[in-house]
Swiss-Prot record:
InterPro entries, A to Z: Elong-fact-P_C, NA-bd_OB-fold, Rib_uL2_dom2, Transl_elong_fac_P/YeiP, Transl_elong_KOW-like, Transl_elong_P/YeiP_cen, Transl_elong_P/YeiP_CS, Transl_elongation_fac_P
Protein name: Elongation factor P
Cysteines engaged in disulfide bonds, as pairs: none
Function: Involved in peptide bond synthesis. Stimulates efficient translation and peptide-bond synthesis on native or reconstituted 70S ribosomes in vitro. Probably functions indirectly by altering the affinity of the ribosome for aminoacyl-tRNA, thus increasing their reactivity as acceptors for peptidyl transferase.
CDD domains on file: S1_EF-P_repeat_1 (cd04470), S1_EF-P_repeat_2 (cd05794)
GO CC list: cytoplasm
Keyword field: Cytoplasm, Elongation factor, Protein biosynthesis
NCBIfam families: efp, PRK00529.1
GO molecular function, a single term: translation elongation factor activity
Keyword Transport on entry: no
HAMAP family: EF_P (MF_00141)
A Gene Ontology BP annotation from the UniProt entry: peptide biosynthetic process
Gene, per the UniProt record: efp
Family from the record: Belongs to the elongation factor P family.
Amino acid sequence: MISVNDFKTGLTISVDNGIWKVLDFQHVKPGKGSAFVRSKLRNLRTGAIQEKTFRGGEKVETALIENRRMQYLYADGDTHVFMDNQTFEQTELPADYLEYELNFLKANMEVQIQSYENETLGVELPKTVELTVTETEPGIKGDTANGATKSATVETGYTLNVPLFVNEGDVLVINTGDGSYISRA
């Protein structure tokens, strides 16, 4: 149990039959009435984001999330197979668990699998990945007035905006948080 007064960003709690991650919180002490904590929470099972208000001093249950380092092996239809690096145990996850993550997953990539009481909640990717450009228009020399961009498709099928100097075959560093171009590798 933890007091809502001790909330921290990234804390996982169990409230209303759900496992929630604290994204943001604010302690509020109005001039009249008692203090409360306004929080923004993400449901780790569904991905839904909800704002919730707790009375000051209220206690909530902490949820101990287990993070296991695993290696992505391969896709088998709509199932994706991961292997635990210590035990070599294989875990299969359906594609609907990995909708966004599939844009960046490559064979042999190391990821963190998050679970709570043996229930898999999701996959945490590395902050950046290196992917090869498979398709893009050729850049036009001299057409760089205002940091212009063009569309490029990488080896996983993900499409993003890149600077004009990027060509097919280039390896890009991509931010997995928002899917944006960072640099060439």
